[in-house]
Amino acid sequence: MLAGLAMLAGAALVTDRPDAAGPLDRLDQFRTLARARSLGNGSPEGSSPDTYREMYALLDEEIVESLGTGGLYASTGFLQDRLDAFGEAWGAAAVDVVRVGRLMVGAFQMSDAPGVNSVRVYGRLGGEAALLTTLSRDGRPVVYPWAPAPGGAAQFVAAWEGSATGRGIRALRLDLVRQQGDDLRVVWSSSDLFPEALMVRAYSVRSGEIRVRYEPEYRGHTPGCEGQTEAEDVFRAAPESGTLVRRAGREVNAWHRELRATAARLFDALAAGDEASLAKLVADPQIRGRLPSTLRPDAACDAADSLTNPVTVSVAATAEHTPWALTFRRAGARWRLTAAGPVLP
């Protein structure tokens, strides 16, 4: 009985729509474009944003038509089913739509090529359904609904995720997007706080709060190494402006930043010939006497006796093209150099 009702409902969706042939023709056009252009074949022409313009136009038409028809056709569930069919036709596309107030927001992942993926916002313009704006960044887009701004304007968070490394680290950009009349604009972005790149291990967006666990930059930080310091920051909405305020949270493996700060002071003292500072870092005068002024840090991972709470750590260095090993030992909250010497071949 239920299956029969579902079939009747499906038939109604096809026959009751004012121009039922439209979506079928549009889907066929989409399939033809996907086959003919061989997108993602690695050529510069096949990976450019312009190559996807016609495909985006078809998807925009599909969504705008459904929103204009209204009723069940304008529901998130119906639109998602239709867009899933387009995604299956292309194979490489993934489209997710979410309702944000009176807006319909879509996250379109069409390719791994830079600048191709987009977030597209649909709503009413002059009383008609329309595409209001698009955002395009590098990475895979994910849309999270957000509480309205103090004045009631609709908002959402757009996350742009890069590909994960073998260690589970990925580039991330977060944008808070707010409706302003018939337009939308980014009112806050993580790129303002992290202009180079925000490399995260994990993040979450829920209940008016964003948590981000990432690798901060500091002297001695070496990308790709285990056991380095990670920070967890919390972003919450400011009551007055509705934009996000950063609140520092906990640190993981804080010992590595402290160790590397000690190592940096050691290298600086050697380069400057600062014997007083050197004596505070190296208690043994014989070890101090062996250290060359040309000693510099080497871009290699540290060797610690524990990744979470080490007592001794070996740090790689170099002097006049000769590799050195520096052994630091923790005494309370301080790190001191207790052994040093060239690495024999």
Where in this protein do the model-derived segments appear?
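Terminal domain-start segments
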Residues: D16-G126, A130-L135, E275-A276
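Structural signature of eukaryotic scaffold interfaces centered on beta-propeller domains
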Residues: G87-R102, Y144-G152, A202-R206
